C-alpha cells in the first residue's frame, strides 16, 4: 500500500524548513527519510510517535496524524 505524503511534506516545510532538519529530528539520515517519503520503506511506529508527541506546539490529534502518515494514494 502506498501513502500520499503531500501533507507531511507541507508539515515539514512549516515546522522544520528542510528535509534534513526533519531527518535530524527523527534521528535518521536524509537518504532514509527519502526512502520513507517515496514509499520504499515505511515510517516506524517510533518515528510517528515522535512526531505526534514531541512537537513544540503540543501533541498532534489523531486526525492530523492520519492526514500526515496514513493518507492513501
Per-segment meaning from a language model:
Residues 7-8, 33, 47-50:
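A general alpha-helix detector
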Residues 1-17, 21, 25:
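A short, Lys/Arg-rich alpha-helix, primarily the initiator
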Residues 13, 38-40, 49, 53:
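Residue-level detection of the helix-turn-helix DNA-binding "recognition helix"
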Residues 2, 35, 62-73:
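Short, charged recognition helix plus adjacent turn
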Residues 19, 30, 45-48:
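Helix-turn-helix DNA-binding elements, focusing on the entry/boundary residues of the two helices
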Residues 28-43:
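Recognition helix of helix-turn-helix/homeodomain-like DNA-binding domains
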Residues 46-64:
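DNA major-groove recognition helix of helix-turn-helix/homeodomain DNA-binding modules
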